[in-house]
Amino acid sequence: MRLYITGGTGLVGSNIIRLARRRNDIEIIASQYGPAPEWQVDYQLDPLDMADADAVRASIRRYQPDAVIHCAAMLDHVYMQHHRAEAWRATVDANLAFAQSCAEVGARYIFVSSDWVFDGQEPLVSEESPPNPVNFYGFMKAVCERDIMGLPGLSYGIGRMAGIYGLNYAIPHLLMKDNHLGFPITNYIIDRLSQGLIAEIWTGPKVNDMAHASLASDGAELLLRLVEHDENGIFHCWGSEPANRLELAHKIADVFEFDHSLIVPTPTDPIVLDEFRHVRIPFRMVANSELSYKALGRRSYNLVDGLRAFKAELAAQL
């Protein structure tokens, strides 16, 4: 199988490449934009600007992949808010170019989406719940999903992820370890507690207080399963257990044997609140993902199992 991956130097993409390398039946092509990978590159690299839809189409036609996993995404919400046309080209237009090109060459298309297609106000959502995004990022992801589902002749899977943590194997120093209004705070908490430093857990206002934290390697394995799955649809590839921010922090302390007293709930940083004053944040994300588990043949990690697996991955790097 010839597998084309975007975002291969990111958290999810590097984990997909790492898993695909272990298989003898996968030839890897990875698009590149920005810093070059720091690990040994034993696969094809294709320089590509996602904002150039014609370049996207030309790349897929050139490589004729059997499957494409589109992980690349803009993640700076403040920047996107102020540069909407640029973000739209790199997200919505790029997605449509990938999807149309995959339909043209007969490739299966896997698009990595987000729990932020929802507003965070419903008590429970599923793969079948209608999206209701509250910020520009979530709106673009929802538009991408709709464009994919409306394209005739396309074999596709939409894999939603949330609160991603783990190792960036391609460019380790790019790993985000900052506090966040969203739910990707696991790496931040581990980094602080491992140094014996206080980990401030923002409790509001304006935080994603509850979500399904997702280990990148676990999500990557589910996305690879989605490549080989023959059903079209939306699939939840995030962690199987929801938790709020403080519950997550204390589970981390339990698994890694850190000092719980260093976990300090605190109001959201007013400077960050001002920066995000025009960006709404989904508050509470809880999902039923049984349809995805049945289709893909297994459940994703629960919170403790995911953290234990991450602890083992960190130990293997020493």
What are the language-model segments listed below?
Residues T6, I201-M210, F235-P242, A295:
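Glycine-rich Rossmann NAD(P)(H)-binding loop
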Residues L222-R277, A315-L318:
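Mid/C-terminal beta-alpha module of Rossmann-like enzyme folds, strongest
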Residues A216, N244-H250, T268-D305, Q317-L318:
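Conserved C-terminal active-site "lid" loop/helix of NAD(P)H-dependent oxidoreductases
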Residues N132-A162:
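Active-site Tyr-X1-5-Lys
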Residues P47-T91, S101:
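NAD(P)H-binding glycine-rich loop region in Rossmannoid oxidoreductase-like domains
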